[in-house]
């Protein structure tokens, strides 16, 4: 053994060839933490010191190659002063450069996922052989940063600037065939042949059949683009990517600027340019928020995994109530491998559900994400029925009938009598108390809420609601089923609106107050979209449905009368009374026309403005900042209350619920991280400025206590 550590070993194979193997002890994946980096330094030094070594192959002892840097460790480094962070980055890069400069040929065998620092390690090798099933990429822009271990330097010199810009700015994962096509790897082989192929390649380089020094040289030099080519390539790319990423996500454009700045430098000077830009991005609030989201997501996955220990396997599911929602749930279940019965009392409902599922599956085939054979298999896994005849073998039933407590109770009691005693019942309700619905059941311990968001196939969140009598097995089984469906489940406790809708309606309450002061809803939409929301509150109301919002508002007002009760008529009331229900009937705050692609397109409608005149209580001048505060303060304070009331267990879950469920701007990190970014004391003072607007704007006693103590929700 030439070197033996806890993350890396270097051992002799044959004919002067050694194998550098990444296999981090005690972990399921390889990642670049401090230990691995230190051992890579020691491994490279050991190889350099051994004159008998003629070639190196790099392998992994895990199912993945290397998933990237250990964010939990490196995020602490981002708090260091700039010069220390730059120095640390360059020190790490020196390890990769020393590996690249070894006096012998190097071949990297990519057996599985190689992302971020993992792929940057691959780029430092002379040759790369990739398994057919592996994926490679540089996803750092999704964390608000860009590659920091030489990715912006080596990738353009390996696959060309245009391809590198696309890979780095998009952060996408790339399959083996695509990687081979652009020259990111030199060969693609079956998984079982990978090591053999790597050995063959290194032997050919040792024998001189392949000129590894010539292969290495372009990575050490400046980019082969003249001034005009550089200008055309970089300026066009910056313009296009800026348009795609928007002003709130600077990392993709900064990555292109870095490649451009380093274009005329050799490797070592180019790495200095990369390090300087990397540090600049690492210090931004966007990076802090997006890295925070990544860590929150990891925390959620760990919690969801914990549920697996007691969850029952779901081999057959059922959905009650077909239609668009039922069809969406059936599609999601069947397309992810769980057969499902779809029951409705009406033939039209069944037909609508099947049409929805078929349409969604057809779109996947059109986009090349599914074969026609797989589509047929998924459609066959949806079994439409108008009776309970086959329900005896069902493991979980998702009730998705009309949002009416009496109807839901009747349907749930009915299905409870025909399923096995251990079958789980789950209600897809958005506002109705799970404990209330459970009163109709003989086995309330087997009952939970399972709130899908519309459209089911697009929205990643599922709220799993624990009622007063819900068992942990019922909760765990529902969480496991949601994960199996490809969703991100969050467990919340029962209350009106649960987490997401309870937080969303105070946001709409702020919108209602602005309209009462005569503020133009189009202006409000523009301000909130600029703030980072995918759509403003007026447009969102139309998309959700004014009738849905009206009903939800009444449920929330009944649940929290101290702050959500409504005095007098509101915009939602006048729209509802005028039968302006939003996109579903072509008119709400906006009117809707069909565009060339058959999609609804919003246009201004004088009738809406006329209706809204009746609910103006006083004309008030407000700034754009006021609009943001009117909307965001109630949302943030209600999120705080949900955490304090134990509706959600952690700040991470609360924030991820809002990101996944209502499209909270990811670059702001979630409601609680948004408060942290302002400062808890500063946020409390800001809320107090709007105290005259009512209880929705009044901070809790505990939040005031946090402000006084200088505490934060994160860190």
Curated annotation (Swiss-Prot):
The active site is at residue 451. NAD(+) binds at residues 325, 344, 401-403, 408, 430, 454. GO terms for cellular component: fatty acid beta-oxidation multienzyme complex. SUPFAM superfamilies: 6-phosphogluconate dehydrogenase C-terminal domain-like, ClpP/crotonase, NAD(P)-binding Rossmann-fold domains. The record marks 120, 140 as: Important for catalytic activity. One of its GO terms (molecular function) is long-chain-3-hydroxyacyl-CoA dehydrogenase activity. Its EC number is 4.2.1.17, 5.1.2.3, 5.3.3.8, 1.1.1.35. Keywords: Fatty acid metabolism, Isomerase, Lipid degradation, Lipid metabolism, Lyase, Multifunctional enzyme, NAD, Oxidoreductase. Residues 312-715 are annotated as: 3-hydroxyacyl-CoA dehydrogenase. Pathway: Lipid metabolism; fatty acid beta-oxidation. Substrate binds at residues 297, 501, 660. Residues 1-190 are annotated as: Enoyl-CoA hydratase/isomerase. Signal peptide: none annotated. Pfam families: 3HCDH, 3HCDH_N, ECH_1. GO terms for biological process: fatty acid beta-oxidation. It catalyses: a (3S)-3-hydroxyacyl-CoA + NAD(+) = a 3-oxoacyl-CoA + NADH + H(+); a (3S)-3-hydroxyacyl-CoA = a (2E)-enoyl-CoA + H2O; a 4-saturated-(3S)-3-hydroxyacyl-CoA = a (3E)-enoyl-CoA + H2O; (3S)-3-hydroxybutanoyl-CoA = (3R)-3-hydroxybutanoyl-CoA. Involved in the aerobic and anaerobic degradation of long-chain fatty acids via beta-oxidation cycle. Catalyzes the formation of 3-oxoacyl-CoA from enoyl-CoA via L-3-hydroxyacyl-CoA. It can also use D-3-hydroxyacyl-CoA and cis-3-enoyl-CoA as substrate. In the N-terminal section; belongs to the enoyl-CoA hydratase/isomerase family. Heterotetramer of two alpha chains (FadB) and two beta chains (FadA). This is Fatty acid oxidation complex subunit alpha. The lineage of its organism: Bacteria, Pseudomonadati, Pseudomonadota, Gammaproteobacteria, Pseudomonadales.
